[in-house]
Amino acid sequence: MKTELCLFDRTLNLQRYPKRAQELLQAWDAGDEFIIKHVEEELNLEDNKNILILNDNFGALSCWFSEKHNVTMMTDSFVSQRGTLKNLQRNQCNRVQLISSTEEMPEGFDLVIMQIPKNNRMLAWQLQQLRQSMTAECPIIAVNKAKEIHSSTLEVFEDYLGETKTSLAWKKHRLVFSNANATNPLTIAEAVCWSVDNEDIDLLNYPNVYSGERLDQGARFMLEHIPVDAELRHIIDLGCGNGVLSVKAAQLNPEARITCIDESFMAVESARRNLEVNLGKERQFQFIANNCLDGFKKHSSYLVLCNPPFHQGQAVTDHIAWQMFCDAKHILCKEGKLLVIGNRHLDYDDKLCRLFGEENVTTIASNSKFVILEAVKAEKSK
């Protein structure tokens, strides 16, 4: 896998995070190259400009522009933030200010660079923040694959930010040029709230949380199969999203300590709010933005609930699910359980059988779209 980004007689060594022995995916894409090429060839920026970068996947843009400018990188991804930091260190770059999506968007920038997020609600939210924080003179340059930039995408820019135009395609990517000059911009609420049908659960979702305006079918199916057990002293919701599984687990197991983990800062904050509103602040809850279960002690949990993602940023991949399963096995107590839901076509049962042993994996429930699997950590497992 290529790890060296070479442009304008300069080379950066860039790697994805977490680092894998046989990495198949690159830490940057042609969109990163397109933005670098445009800024270097067309903008003629003087040194020491203040640049805001949104959604830098693994720090390619932050590493590049930090050489001559004052860079702030804002992201909703703990993994992207940690990957950016590692690449900055790897290339001995100048300091970059790293901030999360749940912090207030800073002001006073000369240029904004943006990787367009997959989630349209997140896009609208970020554009609204830019409209409120940036001057009309500040250029805002966004990038995505050409096939992902539709007329509706440009309408979102115009509705929430201001005047917008696009570039020609280059290496299957296009740039979007905009300014914060809309006179009557649309507005979007910071969060969406709703109640779960047939459950005593009220939910709030911040903009980048999966299934933002209703409960997704997989989570609804999983709610029906969360166990009740007085011995469950510590339950981990791995990839917690808005925390709906944690809320249900806490309702069913009032003595259990609940830990919500996600790599999305907005997901973690949604889960925090939802557990505290539905169950009160007196319960033992913990909320962590993390790369899976990094740093957790061995034999520290009795049950792990897991609804794995099958993408990282724009890339479709199953390595996150595998890492989640491996981490869960490591931190489970003897006879502890991993409860997993996934689409039937993802074949999670094969992965779990390899990891836990075929005799320790059971199908708990299934329907035409989803399957719920239980993997038990055997008494003799390491």
Swiss-Prot record:
Its main location: cytoplasm. Keywords: Cytoplasm, Methyltransferase, rRNA processing, S-adenosyl-L-methionine, Transferase. It holds the Pfam family MTS. One of its GO terms (cellular component) is cytoplasm. SUPFAM superfamilies: S-adenosyl-L-methionine-dependent methyltransferases (SSF53335). Transmembrane segments: none annotated. It catalyses: guanosine(1835) in 23S rRNA + S-adenosyl-L-methionine = N(2)-methylguanosine(1835) in 23S rRNA + S-adenosyl-L-homocysteine + H(+). One of its GO terms (molecular function) is 23S rRNA (guanine(1835)-N(2))-methyltransferase activity. The keyword Isomerase does not apply. It is found in: Cytoplasm. Its EC number is 2.1.1.174. PANTHER family: RIBOSOMAL RNA LARGE SUBUNIT METHYLTRANSFERASE G, RIBOSOMAL RNA SMALL SUBUNIT METHYLTRANSFERASE C. Specifically methylates the guanine in position 1835 (m2G1835) of 23S rRNA. Belongs to the methyltransferase superfamily. RlmG family. This is Ribosomal RNA large subunit methyltransferase G. It comes from Aliivibrio salmonicida (strain LFI1238) (Vibrio salmonicida (strain LFI1238)).
